[in-house]
């Protein structure tokens, strides 16, 4: 059973490590798990619980610094007499959604914060229980050690995965907003680079062939989107076309674009701050 337990713990460790960024966090995880391996130590679960709780605390503090949580538009102190007191739940919330509003998280990102927060809070409460050495928490049997430590690490890993999932969904939302902006740029606004080529033009579609992140700071993401826009050029009026005096041709033109997307603001949403789209019509004149 002990070998089976060690394999379980090692598997969980390998799953958790990629989410830890600092050498301190990684060393603390290693030290926490080392406590569990010492079968002769009657305090092994207590020592593990203390180290694991501190790891979670440091991880949350890194992802949700005091100043950021306090400035989040959704933040309200639980105790008006302690306006700068931050609860564990508020740190968990910031780690997952940052400045984004609850409405945006629920309806756009589709993330259930309550379930994740509840599971992690339960795990931390379990850890706290074993950091207090009492007769019932001292020298516990291997089955209890296995059950408690496994559930705690599973909930911790689930929390880490939720944060990563939130980041991925923010990225997907940014991509979707860029696509919507390109629709507006090509289908609603008049593109002078295309308009000068014919009497009338019609956009048939566009294709983004490359979308890359150029830069990211604590408020904005700068994205670059390159691709092609397919257009139909009409020479002559609609009347000319009916009389057979006009003509239409279809061409494909390359475009490049840059977008600055704001993801951290007091509106609690994600929106495009600026968009620059350039269509290259040089190939038309070659």
List each language-model region with its residue ranges:
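Short, well-structured alpha-helical interface segments that form or flank functional binding sites
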Residues: 24-27, 43-54, 115-118, 122, ...
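Short, hydrophobic, well-ordered secondary-structure elements
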Residues: 33, 44-67
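Short, solvent-exposed secondary-structure capping/transition elements
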Residues: 60-72, 136-141, 158-169, 236-240
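Short, charged amphipathic alpha-helical segments flanked by flexible coils
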Residues: 68-113
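Charged alpha-helical initiation segments
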Residues: 1-46
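Short, mixed-charge amphipathic alpha-helical segments
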Residues: 97-123, 209-216
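Charge-enriched, short contiguous segments at helix-coil
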Residues: 113-161
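Cystatin/cathelin-like cysteine-protease inhibitor module
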Residues: 152-286
């Amino acid at each position: 059973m002990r070998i089976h337990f060690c394999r379980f713990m090692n598997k969980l460790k390998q799953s958790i490590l990629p989410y830890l960024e600092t050498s301190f966090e990684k060393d603390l995880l290693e030290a926490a798990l080392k406590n569990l391996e010492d079968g002769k130590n009657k305090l092994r679960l207590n020592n593990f619980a203390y180290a694991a709780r501190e790891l979670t605390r440091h991880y949350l503090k890194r992802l949700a610094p005091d100043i950021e949580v306090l400035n989040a538009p959704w933040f309200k102190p639980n105790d008006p007499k302690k306006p700068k007191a931050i609860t564990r739940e508020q740190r968990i919330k910031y780690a997952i959604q940052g400045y984004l509003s609850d409405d945006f998280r629920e309806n756009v990102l589709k993330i259930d914060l309550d379930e994740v927060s509840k599971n992690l809070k339960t795990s931390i409460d379990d850890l706290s229980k074993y950091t207090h050495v009492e007769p019932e928490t001292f020298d516990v049997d291997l089955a209890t050690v296995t059950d408690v430590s496994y559930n705690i690490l599973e909930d911790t890993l689930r929390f880490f995965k939720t944060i990563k999932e939130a980041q991925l969904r923010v990225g997907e939302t940014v991509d979707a907003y860029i696509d919507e902006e390109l629709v507006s740029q090509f289908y609603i606004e008049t593109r002078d680079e295309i308009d000068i080529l014919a009497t009338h033009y019609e956009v048939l579609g566009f294709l983004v062939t490359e979308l890359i992140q150029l830069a990211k700071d604590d408020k904005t993401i700068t994205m670059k989107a390159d691709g092609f826009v397919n257009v139909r050029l009409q020479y002559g009026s609609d009347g000319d076309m009916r009389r057979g005096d006009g003509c239409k041709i279809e061409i494909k033109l390359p475009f490049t674009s840059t977008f600055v997307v704001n993801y951290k603001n007091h509106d609690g949403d994600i929106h495009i701050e600026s968009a620059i789209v350039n269509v290259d019509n040089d190939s038309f004149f070659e």
